[in-house]
Regions:
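N-terminal cationic and glycine-rich segments that engage phosphates or anionic surfaces
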Residues: 1-99, 103-431
């Protein structure tokens, strides 16, 4: 691997892309540390320390939300905008036609960017009133109060848009998926809380709860097993044999060789996890912002409590959303009819099947089976730590969602780097 890095460093374009990606990540982490003016973040500590949905969102932002920094909103506005635009693309024919145009993806990305700005503005307004109600503002009345409100809301909104820009810059000029890498850096930066979790386990064990001497090693072993499981399942694929017919071009005989169509078990990567997390967090986040009083509003209190991170119904909804998004993304990314038509145009066929509809039907059946296995894999890895946390009564910070995102992004980025090097006849990580 060290030799691979040395080889990569010798390629000027790849070296520049790596340095650019690191520079953007440094800018992002700096933005997560720059405090918003006129806010006393220490007054918000209690709100983020109860293991609620805000604590979870704070973990996804690398602690920027609880510290009221420039990038406090994180990637949530852009993710929610992406969900809305992609769902509308399927539902509205005009947007679907735009997506099919040569520059359709650029137009949809522009629409997503505008939608993300609107969502960021709404979230900024909500967070401002939460900060105000918690007594964390230095000025709340008069001209100073109005100026403070404008500055805080504008800063949060601009920060969210700047995050979107950072992700797009990595996509264009860096290595890997920009959005995923930003989330990756946020999660990794927040893993210092693992030391607090381990210290808490040891303290409880020293206080007489000796079972935690056994629970801690088991937890570490489970984390390693989950990592290995994620790596295996992420790289697993179903290969469909493709046979190309022989044809004569001039005096040369072309084709006749066998190839394969790779269908990855986890085709969608970590995006279903990220999108499901963003969507299911909305009610719980609203409830945390509103601070509903149980005595005054028992119905709404019970409703928002239902979407608490540790609620059984939250787990069920989270699981179903992961399954749904997994199928949704496979459906919009892979078209069996188009694949079958491409094979027929290139004189390729699946042994034992006629070109056309029989081939597309076979690919559809195979995709459905693989997608089900991949969706169950994502759901189990994401939900298992939540269930274990509920059973043990402890908040497991190294959750399946964060672990899956970190491992998945690392593998995707490594694969991108390997592909870049393979095109230049260098031995890559995976070769």
């Amino acid at each position: 691997m060290f030799q691979t890095f040395r080889n990569a460093w010798k390629i000027p374009e790849l070296k520049n892309r790596l340095l650019f990606t690191l520079a953007i990540l440094v800018v992002y982490r700096l933005g997560c540390a720059i405090p918003v003016p006129f806010v006393t973040s220490s007054a918000l500590t209690q709100m983020f320390s109860n293991g609620n949905m805000l604590a979870y969102l704070d973990m996804m932002s690398g602690g920027a939300l609880s510290r009221c920094t420039l990038f406090a909103l994180g990637v949530t506005p852009y993710i929610n905008a992406s969900i809305i635009v992609q769902l509308l693309t399927v539902a509205i024919p005009s947007l679907e036609n735009i997506a099919k145009e040569p520059d359709g993806q650029q137009k949809l990305q522009q629409i997503t960017r505008y939608a993300g700005g609107i969502i960021a503005l709404i979230m900024s307004l909500g967070y401002y009133f939460v900060v105000r109600n918690m007594g964390a503002l230095k000025y709340t009345s008069g001209a100073a109060g109005i100026f403070t409100a404008v500055v805080i809301i504008a800063t949060f909104t601009a920060g969210a848009q700047l995050i979107t820009w950072c992700g797009e810059q990595i996509d264009d000029k860096g290595i890997g998926n920009g959005l995923s890498l930003l989330i990756f850096s946020s999660i990794v930066s927040n893993w210092s809380s693992l030391y607090t979790t381990v210290a808490g386990l040891l303290t409880r064990a020293a206080a007489g709860e000796s079972q935690f001497y056994i629970f801690l090693p088991l937890l570490l072993v489970l984390a390693l097993v989950v990592i290995v499981f994620i790596v295996i399942m992420t790289n697993a694929e179903r290969r469909i044999t493709i046979q190309y017919a022989k044809r004569v071009v001039g005096r040369k005989q072309m084709g006749g060789q066998n190839s394969y169509l790779p269908l990855k078990l986890n085709m969608t990567g970590v995006m279903p996890i990220i999108f499901a997390s963003a969507l299911v967090s909305i009610p719980g986040t609203i409830g945390s912002f509103m601070q509903v009083d149980q005595a005054a509003h028992p119905f709404w209190y019970a409703f928002f409590r239902t979407f608490n991170y540790t609620s059984p119904l939250y787990v069920v909804i989270y699981l179903l959303l992961i399954l749904a998004f997994n199928y949704f993304y496979v459906a919009i990314q892979y078209n069996p009819v188009e694949i079958a038509n491409n094979l027929r145009r290139n004189n390729g066929s699946i042994p034992g099947l006629r070109p056309g509809k029989p081939t597309s039907d076979f690919i559809t059946r195979t995709l459905n089976k693989i997608t089900l296995i991949g969706a169950i894999f994502l759901a189990v890895v994401a939900v298992l730590p939540i269930v274990l946390g509920n059973l043990t009564g402890m908040s497991i910070q190294l959750g399946g969602t964060s672990l899956l995102i970190v491992v998945g992004v690392a593998l995707d980025t490594t694969r991108s780097l390997d592909s870049f090097m393979t095109m230049r006849s260098h031995k890559g990580f995976l070769g």
